[in-house]
Curated annotation (Swiss-Prot):
Enzyme active site: D863, E942, E946
Residue span, GH81 domain: 400-1117
UniProt-listed Gene3D superfamilies: Golgi alpha-mannosidase II, domain 4, Immunoglobulin FC, subunit C
Protein name per UniProt: Glucan endo-1,3-beta-D-glucosidase 1
beta-sandwich subdomain: annotated span: 400-638
Source organism: Saccharomyces cerevisiae (strain ATCC 204508 / S288c) (Baker's yeast)
Miscellaneous comment: Present with 64 molecules/cell in log phase SD medium.
Any one GO BP annotation for this protein: cell wall organization
Organism placement in taxonomy: Eukaryota, Fungi, Dikarya, Ascomycota, Saccharomycotina
Amino acid sequence: MQLYLTLLFLLSFVECSYISFISNNADEILETDLIETLSYATLTVGEPYVAQSVVVTRVSAASHSPLSVSPKNRVSASPINSQDSDSNTRTAVQLSLSLSNYASQVSQKISAQTNNDPVTVSNIYANDNSKSKSSVHNLSSVSGVASVMPSASTMRKVTTLLSQTASTSTSTLFSSSLSISGTQLNGTLLTSVSKGTIDPLVTQMPSYSSQETKIIPSSLTSNKTIYTISVRTNAATATGEDSFIASTPASSTLFYPSNSTQDLVQTLASTTASPAYPSNRTQITLSPSVSLYSTTSPIYPSNITENGSSPSPSLSSTVSPVYPSSSTGNILLSSLFSTVDSSSSPVSSTLDTIYVSSSMQATISSSSSSRQTKTSSSSLSTSTSSTATTTENSSTTTIVNLFNAVSTDEPPTVFDRSPNPMSLADGVSNDGPIQTNKFYTNLIVGSQESPAFVYPYSLWKYTSSSYGFAVQHTTVDQYSYGGYDSSGNAEYLVNPLGIAHVVFSASNFDSSMTMQVDEMTLSSTRVVLSESNDSSNYLEIPLVQGMGFATGIYHGSLNAKIGSSVGFNTIVSESSSNLAQGILKYRITLLNGVTWLCYVIGPDDLTSTDFSLEVSSEYEIKASASVDGLIIQLAVAPSETDYEVFYDQAAGMYVTNFKLQGVSDGSTATYEFSYTTQGESASGSTMIFALPHHESSFSDIMQDYYTGIQLASTTKGVMNGYLTTSLQFSTSLNRQISWLPWSSQLGSNLLEYSKEQLQLLAEVANSELQVSISESISGLNTYYLGKVIDKYSYILLTVSEIIQDEASTKSTLENIKSAFDILLQNEQTYPLIYDTKFNGLVSSGDWGSTSTQYDFGNTYYNDHHFHYGYIIHAAAVIGYVDSKLNGTWAADNKDWVNSLVRDVANPSEKDEYFAQSRMFDWFNGHSWAAGLYENGNGKNEESSSEDYNFAYAMKLWGATIGDQSMELRGDLMISIMKDAMNDYFYYQNDNTVEPEEIIGNKVSGILFDNIIDYTTYFGTNTEYIHGIHMLPITPVSSNIRSETFVEEEWQTKIEPIIESIESGWTGILKLNQALFDPVDSYAFFSDSTFDSSTYLDNGMSRTWALAFSGGLANSIA
């Protein structure tokens, strides 16, 4: 009892106190608030946790120290765990804190439950604020829990950044009891998906032609073990005219398993090849330019820059990059580089290769020349050289800039130049290539009144009573479902549209208000609203993926106004000691019960006497005066009022875009979204929301910025708020995936084929190769011809790498080369055009109309990754096999193929001929297939599998031409899509991201920004909906589609219908079965009665189906 009285006495004098909870062990102290100073300026930095299973480290009572933070400096709310500790652990004390109002006093009750008896301490103090607040705190909001370490993966940290004596005062400015109904409250639903008749399967039959060269099945008399070859090369650059050369002579290293034999060594054309074991050193390219600086950050990419119009390195003395802890043994941990002289002309100087020793310092030297070298597109040239030496032989690690430009040259002239016939909306402009597939497409085409989905908000041009820009956030309880099947699974999930919760407006705006959209990047754009008669009076609204605030910046003499179609219930002015100086805070509760926080920041420190928001009606709030440079920030108030402090600490700073940067050591990739910010906040950071799949690959440091604030997205689960200016990631790359069949079951095991399997493969390949591939693609659009050419590239791989028949390999290679020549000469049915308006390569198929869909809308940037992925993979296979036969096909045609890569996935802003990352959305973790089309439900993607098929193709093409940046970037995209697609597209039974109402569907169907629709654009058959997320089945498929998921999907959706399906979809579904049951899959394709004309479309071969399922069936049995 004496202990309780002592604690009570202490609490009566200190509002934020240091309390020790004593357990059974008299020498064990559990620190709950690590703070000693009573200064009002001091900020507590600690780690409260959600009350789950945790362990507590024993600490010394004297080990704590006060922490203080300057409001103008960025705060990292890091763990306080520098204390001396031992290894003994105990069950954590479970804390709860509650505050409740009692007239003019606040009673504060803190309770602690140990393994024995509860301990309770109360503190009552006077509250002089004009209005008291009630709130409930649990463990996740208690300040300063120290040395608490998570013991389970489900543990979530909550950053604490609280003023020691934080206080809030409130004053109600407006209250209304007006009732609302109809669209004001519920919005409108857009659920229809237009259906077409174009089937993704290739129905045109091949053009048969007798081939003299055939495989002799009887010659295959023994079983074979196939050693999977992973080719890693340094950059061998085939440069175009007038380009700057910055590359080293091509060289390659082939990696074999430890039991490989010397006769497996293949010599690549124009390269110096040597077999090596994985522990031997490798070469990695850093180009076109890399700037390395000493850093203690675990995120290396932020120290890489590209500057200048030509490649040039900038290195500092004694570089100490820090690499992810998950990387393998040959990791650089301390200063490894000596001073590098880069003082010579930067015109063509570059750092080509770094060898990093795990035990010795490496000296890097670089020679350069200002000489400009001109070469033809088919030549390989070197104008610089770099060497790296170590004092002794040792294993090395290497670093690759993942976002090196593929090229900065003009696309080949074989592509005609012409501006796209699609018209942009008025007021749309950009300094550089215009993005065609990003979240803001609705703002640049059509009426410009459909929303941009900037998770967690949607925003759109508002032209009703309050002209301006509307902001909406919908919650999980506003999801609508419909079309339930007999198992209770909903056909669709849809969010309401058109609920203008708040509207950025101005008293000056009317129906003549103009809208401009500019500064378009892969992550952001800017909307500018202005008076029609005076453009100096304008409102700018930056739209950035992940933004925690909707922000409007008022310029000129605009008189700010906030509107709402829902209507205002109450408006309260608040003050908070957690705000940076000069920020005014308001709490706006709408008539539907939703509360928004509003922060007002002026160019000079604002006070409530100088400026205020005034209510003019239930639907309008007006500023008391016009202020040039006024900033208004709006955010949905968190459900946990304790977490509101983080919005306070973030207010005043807003984001304008983010830069994408990353590096890889060959097995792990680290990358980040580095946000550009404006303004100042109390914490030096702002609020950024992350999607569920981000959490799977966050770097450890991100847990220190977690706030506990959660907001629902429209179709991608719950987002978490972070007090930060960057999102940082580290992820492992699956480097087992290469040319030949692979599954997660196979892992690092070797492929094996029996002689009987090889003989059947030979017979089927002989039959399927009796064609003219050139004639077989005649009359096909870009999508279909890509599928057909790629079909034969997989047969070529099978003949070359599995059957290993040289004569048939050569004849098949020539057959497919002849077909590809049609593309290289741009003489296919719908030639490609370089679009000078949107800076991309498009099909001419729909040049005359946006509604014809002859080429699935490729002309207007639909499906480019689907179409070009097949072509790029075929090119990679041709180049790979050709190089083994001492050919130079890849080097000769590199620029043409690279143009397709650049159109879809240009990684660098330095490439001015193509939009950066046109299709792949790095924030969402997958691509968007829809191009320049307005849609009220936002962007969409139907075929997830053809999305990652592009990344796989790009990876292999990068390996073929020695572009390791491209190769590893493909690996990174695959890794990201594995997380994203298993959250949003594929619904394993334990999926916790999407609602249970649709989990039973097993796949999304078409995933939109605003709706998940279990259907396809070409029909509602079950095999269509699931098959479009399967095709094509390739070595990368199992990395994305897990064995568990595929089996669940098979049992619930496919097995009940498979016997009734007799079409090309049958072959797709059965080959997909090989990802979990390759034995049964192989039995289907090897059956003597198998009918290819019934079960396969012309985009799929029986040869590859047998090679894929058969190899896996043998190797994992």
